[in-house]
């Protein structure tokens, strides 16, 4: 498949992909994620169409907590909804993340992973914000450079739609979000070709509608609550295979080799780094240098962090 090349940063790559699959974007700015929402807002104002032939409706809220609440409500109304955030902004979204995941709604949060403020503020990249979301029920998919953001961000949206599990798609703040690279860009027709339109239709049919009312958000005692929580396990068990399926479709179109875990380095390595994010590109350069000197070292790149499938690690 032939793709055109453009020079852009990680935020622009994520915005380009997310716009294709988004009907409503609930936004609130926070460094270093703000450009993603800015791009989406600009494209919406210009009337740019997504893969469904409509213009994204953008709503800026009063805070990140409001943006997450708007995502939750919009998803319940049957609109594929996205937001963009980082750091303390992501923490403010956690209460709604539990609800979105618990109700099996296919929202996607694009996160420029950033340090959490502690003794002082830091706007630079680390994974302390996304690590605070491990237990929310969101699937978590990560990329290590701008081209990977372009290539794999569709997997988050596509797997969320088919698997009925929300996704947190993350890449490192500034190190990837603001790094400018020449990247091969998705054409929206190719993204549309990979989208399961039957799953989109089923999602819209589950929306709140007075023509077929349902009761949601009620109270349950411990016995029933526990059973209903366990009932969602089958959706999480299916996510790794669904992600692999869409990675396979991406690989087929692009000639890439994306997997849940990718290995790089000596086949008989006696020392291996397990990592995710922008450190992987640096590690690959170090591995090239060390293996050239006869050292047996390698890298396992983690792409799907949640749900974690340890058995898949043996594949690498």
PLM region spans:
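Redox- and metal-dependent alpha/beta enzyme cores, enriched for Fe-S-associated oxidoreductases
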Residues: 263-295, 308-312
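Glycine-/acidic-rich phosphate or pyrophosphate-binding loops and their flanking alpha/beta elements
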Residues: 7-13, 248-271, 284, 288
